[in-house]
Amino acid sequence: LISAEVLFSSVGWILLLALIQILIAIFRKPLIKLYVFLITILELASLKKRLMAIPRMTAAMPASFGILCIAVFITGLCTSWHNKTAFHKLMSGKTIGEVEHTLTEKDHAVLYLPIYRLDFSIYANQLAAHQITQLIRAAHTVKVDSCSYRSPNIVLIIGESYGRHHSQQYGYFMETTPRQTALEKSRKLTKFTDVVTCWNLTSFVFKNMLSTHVIGEKGEWCDYPLFPEVFRKAGYNVTFITNEFLPQAKEAVYDFSGGFFLNNPELSKLQFDHRNTQLHDLDDGLLKDYDDSLKTFQKEHNLTIFHLMGQHVNYKLRYRKEQAKFWASSYEEKRPKLTTAQRKMLSHYDNATLYNDSIVAQIVKRFQKEDAVVIYVPDHGEECYEEDRGFICRNHSANIDWPLAHYEFEIPFWIYCSPKYIRNHRDIYRQIRKAKDKRFMT
């Protein structure tokens, strides 16, 4: 026999559940019939009450329903009026860049209905298609009469979200760029001291950096050829290795705006001979792409473009944890006004900058024995609790004051010349050294 102690223990509950399951299995059909009978009785009773209430409801319905509809309409209009005006502004943009900039505003439209999102997608693609047409037309105007190939190997590294005030090279109190600093001391790397970006939004920078259009000239960036097209026409083998702008599902409008002219099939063929095909969690994946396949396509004259993810938010995802050198406690003396959480965020950014230093140094290493020149430039700066401004990333305001210009537009920039390049092109090397303090915009 089973004792009472066993019945009221955990084992007893399991036995009870098993017994219930056995009874349900044995009496399943009678139980189903009983359930159906009870449900039918309840539904008939409910139906009778509803039928008796119909005359009263019908009499009051026209007026009540009309008032309710008006109230709902007025309430909906009042509560969503701001979003409707914001949606109208969004859909009034003349270029995809203008639309993107509108979306950076704090009070931008929220596309909460599927029909809104569909409408916006069609509109954005139409705007992009118009600029694609202009770019293709401009590309076919490119003519190169001759080329000296004085620089047989040109490497362009485009960084991401890198303010120069977090660079050891530019006087930052943390050792975030030890490898670049060492290259600078060797005089192979020339640091430029007064360089600003043309914008603090990646897509805007990419369009203006890759276009031969100069800000201030007539027309738009898409009215002029893209410089990789010019290099291809001149006979250079052009390789583009990006960790950000590849066509992918669920692409944000910012990535679409920055990459649509790179990923259009016709424009891609006009600009690049070779490209990578996948994105990576960390930028060392681009090095593997280059070493495993893209390096084999190098020819006598090459332009190789590396586009890094760099220090883009989320900062803690931009470096390997085992390579971390900075911690929240590292900033207690230098940044005493920051909270522990803010210091932790700052440590993530500086660790990402240190990791970026290692990636850039690895790229330089791959070309140091070639007759090569390597150019490094990030797309724009970045803020990470600078002074008492209290925020990270960027403020995409059209009103540019001094702090915003200082932290988000001032960027590091340098040119590395390999020993072989210096020997073969001393005149170019001297010109680079002479130009290091000149002002210019990317």
Please annotate each region the language model reported.
Residues 1-102:
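Transmembrane and membrane-interface helices of multi-pass
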Residues 71-336, 410, 442:
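Active-site-proximal alpha/beta segments of enzymes that process anionic O-linked groups
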Residues 208, 269-272, 334-345, 426-434:
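Short glycine/proline-rich turn/loop motifs
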Residues 240-242, 303-310, 350-353, 373-378, ...:
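Short beta-strand segments
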Residues 218-225, 343-356, 398-411, 422-442:
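A short beta-strand-to-alpha-helix junction
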Residues 230, 234-240, 293-296, 363-376, ...:
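Catalytic cores of PAPS-dependent sulfotransferases
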Residues 171-175, 372-426:
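Histidine-centered active-site microenvironments of extracellular/periplasmic hydrolases
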